[in-house]
Amino acid sequence: MLKEFKEFISRGNVMDLAVGVIIGGAFTAIVNSLVKYIINPFLGLFVGAIDFSDLVFKIGNATFRVGSFLNAVINFLIIAFVVFLMVKGINKVLRQDKKEEAPAPKDPQLEVLEEIRDSLKKLDK
């Protein structure tokens, strides 16, 4: 069982996933910092509140933390946009690889010469 687990962990997909999760966690910290220390103060210039996490409204005893939700939405949009750019870049590289692998179209003159050659071979028989 230990051998099977070692084989499972050693597969490329599992290792890629582990690296992705670790980098994703670090990237989330960067995005949180970007939103909290750069984007929110910039938006705060227009709204009047620099820290959106304190933005709340109350109805009766219920407290709605709209600011925390806005922070989460901004984080999500930034992460989604970066992932979109990464996928777009990867797809572009993959398309270029496929173009390089595709055989070059035959030269029309070469095709005519091959037909002539084949016809001459038939005549010799």
UniProtKB/Swiss-Prot annotation:
Single GO MF descriptor: mechanosensitive monoatomic ion channel activity
Recorded hits in InterPro entries, A to Z, give: Mechanosensitive_channel_CS, MS_channel, MSC/AndL, MscL_channel
Instruction: Please give the name of this protein.
Output: Large-conductance mechanosensitive channel
For this protein, the record's Pfam families field holds:
MscL (PF01741)
Family to which the UniProt record says this protein belongs: Belongs to the MscL family.
Q: One GO term of the cellular component aspect? A: plasma membrane
Alphabetic keyword roster: Cell membrane, Ion channel, Ion transport, Membrane, Transmembrane, Transmembrane helix, Transport
| Topology relative to the membrane | Multi-pass membrane protein
Function of the molecule: Channel that opens in response to stretch forces in the membrane lipid bilayer. May participate in the regulation of osmotic pressure changes within the cell.
Q: Provide the protein's localization.
A: Cell membrane
State the Gene3D superfamilies in the record: Large-conductance mechanosensitive channel, MscL, domain 1
Look up keyword Transmembrane helix and say if it applies: yes
| Species | Ligilactobacillus salivarius (strain UCC118) (Lactobacillus salivarius)
The record's note on quaternary structure and interaction partners says: Homopentamer.
Please spell out the taxonomic lineage of the organism that makes this protein: Bacteria, Bacillati, Bacillota, Bacilli, Lactobacillales
Residue intervals passing through the bilayer? 19-39, 42-62, 66-86
